[in-house]
Amino acid sequence: MMKTFYVSSYGKNDDKGIYIINLNEETQEFSLVQHIVTQDYPSYMIVRNNTLYIAYKNASRLNNGGGLGSFSIHKDELIINNNYNSNGRSYTHLCVSDNLRYLFAANYHVGSTASYLLENNYIKEKIGAIHHTGLGPDLLKRQT
């Protein structure tokens, strides 16, 4: 029996990206199925409804990268649906609504949350964002 894994890599140059790896459970051998080179660093990934959603960490010195991506899962390969640039914002967590209409992205480093409209597994548009500016009980810890 084969198991498929999606691995994100912060490697340099063409080593960064998404790796699709199969594990043959009988022989305990891994095999590389596909490597998708990405412009930014892929970080958090989730799979919902045969779609891989991914958060990208900005890799640009101009701070104009980062964002989200959507890939259709077809057998053992990923087919890009679209990427959504966030102009320097990088997200650290993703969640898809139960009805598959919304993608929620959060960044605990800066205390922000954004919501995106999904249409046929494509990231259509940002529909809202909030930045938290509260204070916690421990003033020595990050206050986001």
What are these regions (language model features)?
Residues 1-13, 17-22:
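An edge-strand/N-cap motif at the start of beta-rich repeat modules
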Residues 78-144:
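Asp-box/WD-like beta-propeller blade repeats and closely related beta-sheet repeat scaffolds
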Residues 1, 47-50, 96-100:
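Residue-level detector of Asp-centered blade-edge/turn motifs that repeat once per structural unit
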Residues 24-26, 73-76, 118-121:
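Short loop/turn segments that connect beta-strands within beta-propeller blades
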Residues 11-14, 58-62, 109-112:
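Short glycine/acidic-enriched loop and turn motifs that connect beta-strands
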Residues 40-42, 90-91:
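Conserved positions at the start
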Residues 7, 53-55, 105:
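Residue position within the beta-strands of beta-propeller blades
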Residues 17-19, 66-69, 112-114:
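A short loop-to-beta-strand structural motif that recurs across blades of beta-propeller domains
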